[in-house]
Amino acid sequence: MREYIDAAAFKEMMLCADAALSDNIQIINDLNVFPVPDGDTGTNMSLTMNSAAAELRKKSFDAIDAAASCVASALLRGARGNSGVILSLLFRGISRRLKGIETAGAAEFAGALSDGVDAAYKAVMKPAEGTILTVSRLAAAAAVEAANAGASLESALECAIRAGD
């Protein structure tokens, strides 16, 4: 069982996230009914994450903060639509929390997720529930609660996944 996320693990997580978004574009598009049922959330999130994955594939990192910073920058540059911008904001907050950190355990990573949510909510003029913001908030809160209860990194991430499902 992994007790911390290092740069290589973070990179692999992001590449897996890119693949998962690509594989589920239509499902996410079909969920997109608010605030405008334009059916492009999955497409925009996937295209945005593609830009981060492309950057990650070109580089190796010694610490999680460098990998997170790379992801945040690439997402911002490649953001498509509102959901892509929100995704980039989430990772801007995550990256800021991980600054100066080589590896992240359950508490550090859960805190980074929480900071990502805070950054996204603060940047959106009128945050609407029932969106990517809500899913992110629920996932981060579950990770923080689990980490605060002494859960392992793996357990905290599993709690986040279940809460966001």
Predicted feature residues:
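N-terminal loops that bind phosphate or other acidic moieties
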Residues: M1-D165
